[in-house]
Amino acid sequence: MFAIFQTGGKQYKVQQGEKIYVEKLDLEVGSKISFDQVIMVEGSVGTPFVKNAVVNATVIKQGKQKKINIIKFKSKKHHLKRQGHRQPYTQLVIDSISVK
């Protein structure tokens, strides 16, 4: 069984037991979370969400992605600006997908 749910402004297609990376959630490692904004479950499409559908997950890691470098350069002016960014993420493992 698969489901499509949304969190952090993005949509994720998941199956039970799958590990996914989502935008940072303010939760401790080991805590449980349930997503009720389920867009699709095994062929039934919601308008906009499937009623009584829940995706349950457990937080297994909090971290930051690989650093990306941003360089702004003005030619002929000897002006160079360097900046870096590391996007925070939360890694989840999907425990169950249920429709009541």
Curated annotation (Swiss-Prot):
One GO molecular-function entry:
structural constituent of ribosome
Domain of life, per UniProt, equals: Bacteria
Q: Which GO terms describe its cellular component?
A: cytoplasm; ribonucleoprotein complex; ribosome
Kindly list the biological process annotations in GO that this record carries.
Answer: translation
Q: Which UniProt keywords apply?
A: Ribonucleoprotein, Ribosomal protein, RNA-binding, rRNA-binding
Function comment: This protein binds to 23S rRNA in the presence of protein L20.
Family the entry assigns: Belongs to the bacterial ribosomal protein bL21 family.
The protein's assembly and partners: Part of the 50S ribosomal subunit. Contacts protein L20.
What PANTHER family does the annotation carry?
Answer: 50S RIBOSOMAL PROTEIN L21, LARGE RIBOSOMAL SUBUNIT PROTEIN BL21M
Q: What is this protein called?
A: Large ribosomal subunit protein bL21
Native species: Ureaplasma parvum serovar 3 (strain ATCC 700970)
Gene field: rplU
